[in-house]
UniProtKB/Swiss-Prot annotation:
This is ATP synthase subunit beta. GO terms for molecular function: ATP binding; ATP hydrolysis activity; proton-transporting ATP synthase activity, rotational mechanism. It holds the Pfam family ATP-synt_VA_C. Keywords: ATP synthesis, ATP-binding, Cell inner membrane, Cell membrane, CF(1), Hydrogen ion transport, Ion transport, Membrane, Nucleotide-binding, Translocase, Transport. F-type ATPases have 2 components, CF(1) - the catalytic core - and CF(0) - the membrane proton channel. CF(1) has five subunits: alpha(3), beta(3), gamma(1), delta(1), epsilon(1). CF(0) has three main subunits: a(1), b(2) and c(9-12). The alpha and beta chains form an alternating ring which encloses part of the gamma chain. CF(1) is attached to CF(0) by a central stalk formed by the gamma and epsilon chains, while a peripheral stalk is formed by the delta and b chains. Produces ATP from ADP in the presence of a proton gradient across the membrane. The catalytic sites are hosted primarily by the beta subunits. Coiled coil: none annotated. The gene is atpD. It comes from Thiobacillus denitrificans (strain ATCC 25259 / T1).
Length: 459
């Protein structure tokens, strides 16, 4: 513990001078009492001066103020006391519900698990959501990118995943809001409360209006909380919304530190920063962290360095489509655009793989025929094409599902469908066992038996 003095302030970057024999290390946290503020050391400039990034507003700071080195990186509370709470990048509560009271704290900078400690087998994480389990199965410890515009159901899908993991796998979730709109963070908190899943999730926010230091480190704060739960032997979900803003905060910090920008003005350390975060999100022999990352694609350009770097780390992509949402099919997942690395017969088994590919093939055929139907009508199609269209429309509707967290809005009770039932249901439709049932029977049901029951009421 040594004392230093502020010698220069440029925006969020603050230079602090320490005695030469007591210079703090890079990534160490420094604190000051009045105003209460934390800094993180980014560079050692020599002559006892370190360059730091402030984890808060630097308004009102002046040269000569005292700063204390803590000897540790930023330490955040971990454990079950964090559940149901909203915290900031430092792990301080911002929900006005008293102190966190956690017994344990952990540093936000840690090494990724060693190769020997990582889980060698691929295990499927059953989500109970038909379209996800069938078309883009998720591996325990996998990373899923969630692509979608405004209002297509990203938040509701995230909430349902949190709920299903909590109820079916007794797992916990951590939600890191990186560069979030404050309004969205507030809405998300209240929706979780209404959906009854708040006590199973820890929320860490670094909002849009906060300095870049907060937004850059808040993902690591959330990840550290998730790692603690994983090391207790649990299956944890980590939600990052939005991973693009993590990159953007890194760009701001990099520019403030005077580094030379690289392609499109991004920081030269883009791949390294992303890798350091992503490599820690993995399964070990004790537990798993499965992450869902909302990905904003600037100007819809998938070759932009930020989304391109993110893609390299993802195991699955979940694309929410406005066209699907307009048909009233929720979750509005595009089954032809969404992919998973583990949709492979050697991982999921021959039956699952074949059924998923047949479903996609039928839907693709319908997509190709749609223009002909729009111009000439159904009557001009060959009998085989008519059958393919009829099955595709049933499949399309069967991919919809009532959610538990949406019960309060829709009045329809939520459904959890096991992977076995999902495969059996889609297999039967593709093979024509239910060609005689009306397509409305397949809309917003759980398993295939429900569709059969619903058909009786329609006829």
């Amino acid at each position: 513990m040594s004392n230093g003095k502020i010698v220069q302030i440029i925006g969020a970057v603050v230079d602090v001078e320490f005695p030469r024999d007591a210079m703090p290390k890079v990534m160490e946290a420094l604190k000051m009492q009045a105003p209460e503020l934390t800094f993180e050391v980014q560079q050692q400039l020599g002559d006892g001066v370190v360059r730091t990034i402030a984890m808060g507003s630097t308004d009102g700071l002046r040269r000569g103020m005292d700063v204390l080195s803590t000897g540790n990186p930023i330490m955040v509370p971990v454990g079950q006391k964090t559940l149901g709470r909203i915290m900031n990048v430092l792990g301080d509560p911002v929900d006005e519900a008293g102190p966190i009271g956690a017994e344990t704290t952990m540093p936000i900078h840690r090494k990724a698990p060693a190769y020997a400690d990582q889980a060698a087998t691929v295990e499927i994480l059953e989500t109970g959501i038909k379209v996800i389990d069938l078309i883009m199965p998720i591996a325990k410890g996998g990373k899923v990118g969630l692509f979608g515009g405004a209002g297509v159901g990203k938040t509701v899908t995230l909430m349902e995943l949190i709920r299903n993991i909590a109820v079916q796998h007794s797992g916990f979730s951590v939600f890191a809001g990186v560069g979030e709109r404050t309004r969205e963070g507030n809405d998300f908190y209240h929706e979780m409360k209404e959906g009854g899943v708040l006590d199973k999730v820890a929320l860490v926010y670094g909002q849009m209006n906060e300095p870049p230091g907060n937004r850059l480190r808040v993902a690591l704060t959330g990840l550290t909380m998730a790692e603690y739960f994983r090391d207790e032997g649990r299956d944890v979900l980590l939600f990052v919304d939005n991973i693009y803003r993590y990159t953007l905060a890194g760009t701001e910090v990099s520019a403030l530190l005077g580094r030379m920008p690289s392609a499109v003005g991004y920081q030269p350390t883009l791949a390294d920063e992303m890798g350091r975060l992503q490599e820690r999100i993995t399964s070990t022999k004790t537990g798993s962290i499965t992450s869902f990352q909302a990905v904003y694609v600037p100007a819809d350009d998938l070759t932009d360095p930020s989304p391109a770097t993110t893609f390299a780390h993802l195991d699955a992509t979940l694309v929410l489509s406005r066209q699907v949402a307009e048909l009233g099919i929720y979750p509005a997942v595009d089954p032809l655009d969404s992919t998973s690395r583990i949709l492979d017969p050697q991982v999921v088994g021959e039956e699952h793989y074949t059924v998923a590919r047949k479903v996609q093939g039928t839907l693709q055929k319908y997509k190709e025929l749609r223009d002909i139907i729009a111009i000439l009508g159904m009557d001009e199609l060959s009998p085989e094409d008519k059958l393919a269209v009829s099955r595709a429309r049933k499949l399309q509707r069967f991919l919809s599902q009532p959610f538990f967290v949406a019960e309060v809005f829709t009045g329809a009770p939520g459904k959890y469908v096991t992977l076995k039932d999902t495969i059996a249901g889609f297999k039967a439709i593709v093979e024509g066992e239910y060609d005689h049932l009306p397509e409305q029977a397949f809309y917003m049901v759980g398993g295939i038996e429900e569709a059969v029951e619903k058909a009786k009421t329609i006829q």
